[in-house]
Amino acid sequence: YKSPDELCEVVDKYRELKVPLDGIIQDWQYWGCNENWNSMKFQNPRYINKMGDPEYMKFLPNGEDKNADYGTPRIKSPKEMIDYVHKQNAHIMISVWASFGPWTEMYQKMDSLKALLHFETWPRKAGVKPYDPYNPAARDIYWAAMKKNIFDLGMDAWWLDSTEPDHMDIKDQDFNTQTYLGSFRRVHNAFPLMSNKGVYEHQRATTSDKRVFLLTRSSFLGQQRYASHSWSGDVTSEWSVMRKQLAAGLNYALCGIPYWNTDLGGFFAWRYNNNVNNIAYHELHVRWYQWGVFQPIMRSHNSSPVAVEIYQFGKKGDWSYDALEKYTHLRYRLLPYIYSTSWEVTSKAGSIMRPLMMDFPKDKKVLDMDTEYMFGRNFLVRPVTDSLYTWQDKKQNGHQKDMSKIGKTDVYLPQGARWIDFWTGQTLEGGQTLQREVPIDIMPIYVRAGSILPWGPAVQYSTEKKWDNLTIRIYPGANAEFTLYEDEFDNYNYEKGAYSTITLKWNDQDRTLTIDDRKGSYKGMLKSRKFNLIVVEPGKGCGDGDSTTFDKSISYRGKKVIAKL
């Protein structure tokens, strides 16, 4: 986004369309031109209502027309922009890089400390240099600027870009560059670890009222302890790339790095002529977006000129818009499940995306399977990674096929469990490959028999409604257990024990659900709530809609309850 008005108008549009949204990202160039790269200040005149002011026009980003009439801005300052987003019950993240342009105060300070790495980085030919995150004094300077110029305005989260860092025109001698901990050759791979560490530790020392959230392009082993959420970089919008992203995410999980995501739809849409109206791109984006529901972080992103807000894909009644809207709502209905699974990651060193070998080690067919995985312990997810409803001509223009001819995709159901189709409620035996019909709005999702799923309310943002009236879907066929985790949602009081857990247990033979005593407490905790219980079967408790009838509704006040179903 190139101005506060543009960013805030996107939030407005989502609220107007009643499509859920929790976060929006201010990407680069709020600082201005490349020579002023990553000044960690809002110096672009469009962000501070200084268009036409000679003192600030020198910072206008490269390529923007100095004589263009942008009109009188509605949002006139960065603080006003951040406050506006907050009033719309959303959060804002901002891009911060690991390098600095020669005009910046940060460049001068790092240079005086001998904490710049002197090799070519991006953007080229602007004199930009990476900093030395191995140097604790450099990390102090880095955070001090972030805090003073951005965090103190109310910023919620950080996009730490180029944490490799970008290394252009690579020469072997570049790796002999000296850092605080020795040659760059020796410590290169730990660059993101140290850069993320600096931001995390400084923000934690500043306040415990706001959780640290770091989105970073690169990772190193152990980086998860710094609230680091990795994304897979600027990947191209192609079906083959989407397939490879699946393997990438699962490999991250196997390295013990649980929070990972990919640019939904890909970043560079070259293969679609950089045209968001290309119908073939719509199909790819929809399928990638559907998969995003079952990633630890769900986030759309693309490179200009392609914009990927939902309204770029048509309107209600258009298949691409409807599919995107459907899966956005599905993500929000799964929040109690996802948040509880995240607690398992924190408390038990678990993972959210789970390669099938983790849960089915005796099934040799899944040992190297990279087309499907478990999302938490209950969901089997099989993203659709082939084009079924569009095609492209030699000029890469997209064309739509007859969508009444439903395509299919292979799904393998692992041995050692029975599986219930999330959409239909049909129970299937494990150890078989089936051909699942996949209309454009259906991605294959199966729930392990012997699962308990808390189904959240329909909301426009994650904390809009309390979880005081939850549907509990029980997938029969085996005993089940699930622990519902809750806390204050945005501080570190949980580290001091301020949280609660409620364990639900299903006895399949007796068809009884036991809801144990609630353990723990926190400020604002619900004292009473309703659990609406439903045992899933075909036509009952299926899919992404609300159930209108239940097997039993229970008023729960924190004491053990047993329900016969």
Residue ranges of each PLM-predicted region?
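Accessory, solvent-exposed terminal regions and/or long lumenal/extracellular loops of proteins
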Residues: 442-565
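Catalytic-domain carbohydrate-binding cleft regions of carbohydrate-active enzymes
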Residues: 1-442, 447-448
